[in-house]
Amino acid sequence: PVSWYVATTGNDGNSGTLDSPLKSISKALLRVNPGDTIFLREGAYHEFVTPTRSGEKGKLITLKSYPGETAKIDGTGMTIKGWFSALVQLKSVQYMTFENLHICNATNSDVNTDPEGVYINGVSRDITFRNCKVYNIKSTCLAGHNNGDWRSAHAFLVIGDDNGTPIRNLTIEKCEIYDMHTGTSETLTIAGNVDGFTIQDCEVHDVENIGIIVAGGDNLNAGGNISVNYARNGVVRRNKVYRCSHQVSKDFWEGVYNNPAAYGAIGIYVCGGASTIIEQNIVWECDRAIGLVSESNVLATKDCIVRNNFVYNNYRTGIYLGDYIGYTVGGTSGCYVVNNTLYHNNLVGGALNGSNNSENINDEKDSEGEIRLAENCTNNTIMNNLIYAVTDRDIFVRKYTRSGSKNKIGYNLYYSPTSANHKWFWDGVEYTNFSSWQKASGDENSLYNVDPKLVSLDIFA
C-alpha cells in the first residue's frame, strides 16, 4: 500500500510524497490503487471529489485528514447546479473509506437545485464515512411547494438506483451533521435499492426538516422496480438526534411554505422502508421523534424494530406509526415498539383541525399522543415501554381510526403526575378509565399510575 499526500500548497506535478505533496484531491484519486491511503493536509479544498477507482475486499482506499490536522472539502465559491452535483460523489464506487474530514458549505438559492454534501448511487458498496463533519449544506430557495420547484438539499443522499444490484454495507458512524436547510427533503437519506446499512454514534442536529430517513417507493428513484425499490436491513443505533424542526427556519415554513403550525419534521423516520432496527438513540426537541410511517400508496413500512430509545421534549408525538391520515394507504405492518422511554412530548397540539383531513379529526387542542397510531396499522406490537406524560394536553397512546387490525399492546408503564392527561384513544374513542382502555385496546399486563422513579429529571429541563 502507498500513502499519498495532498496539500493546498502542493503541486499536481509533484510525486505525492509527504515532502512533495500534490495540490488537488482529484489528482491523487487518479493515482490511487486498492489498499492506498490519501492524506489531506490542513486547509480547504475547493473541488468536487469524484473517485473513479475502487478498492477491493481487504484493500480499502482511504481518504482522510493528516493526523492532528483538519481538511475541508469546501464548496465555498463553487457552482452548485441541479441535482446530484454533491461535494463528494460516489457513483458505483466500492471499498472506500472517508475519515476525519469536514464536508461543508454547499449552498444555492435556485429552483430545482439540490445542494448535497455526499451523493452515493449505482452499485456502490462497502463505503464508510467515519468521524466526519457535514454542515452548512443549504438551499435558500424561496419557492413554495405549489410552485412545482421547491427548496431541497441533503447532507447525505444515498439512492440505490440499480434494479439488479443493491447498494450494500454502507456505514456512517461517529459523524456530526448540522446547520442544514433541506426544505422538503431530509438531512440523511437512504432510499431505493439499498440492502444493508449502519448509521451509528452520530449527532444530527439543528436542521430544518427530517433528520434521518430510510425510504422506499420514493420519487428520488421513481423508475425503480417496486420489488426492490426500498431501503432495508439497516441499523440506526446510538445516535443523538435533536432540533430537527421546522422551528429552525420558521420564516420559511410559516411564510413561504404557508404552514402556520410548522411542526412536521421527524427525527428518525422509516418511510416505506423495511427490516430496520432503530435502537439506543436519544431524540429530543424535534417536531416528532421517531416515525414508522408510509407516504407511499404501494409500500408499507414493515418489519422494523424500535427499541431501547430515549425520546423526550419533542414538540409532537414521541413514536408514530401508520399513514398520514387521508393521504396515503401503505401503512405500517409487522413492526415492534418495545423497551422505549417516552417523557414529556407533545409540547404543542396536533396538526389536525377538523377541516384539513378526510376523517374530520381535530387534535390541535390536545395532542397526538406519546405513541401515535394513525391509519392502516396492522400486526404491530407495542410493549414494555415507559410512557411518562407531563403536559396537560398529553395523551399516553392515541389510535385515531378503526383502520388496521391485530395490533398488540401490553406490559407498558403509564404514568403522569398530572391527572388531566390520564387518557388514551383507541379507534378514535377517548378513554380516561384504565380498565375501559384495556378492554377496548386489548392492552394486557400494563401498569397504570405507578411512578417509575426516574433517577433524575435534570436532563429534561
Question: Where are these predicted regions, by residue range?
Answer:
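Boundary/junction segments of secreted and surface-exposed precursor proteins
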Residues: 1-7
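Extracellular beta-strand-rich solenoid/capping regions of secreted or surface-exposed proteins
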Residues: 26, 30-37, 46-62, 72-99, ...
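Short glycine/acidic-rich loop motifs that flank beta-strands on beta-rich extracellular proteins
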Residues: 45-51, 75-86, 107-116, 138-154, ...
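Right-handed parallel beta-helix
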Residues: 60, 66-69, 94-105, 125-140, ...
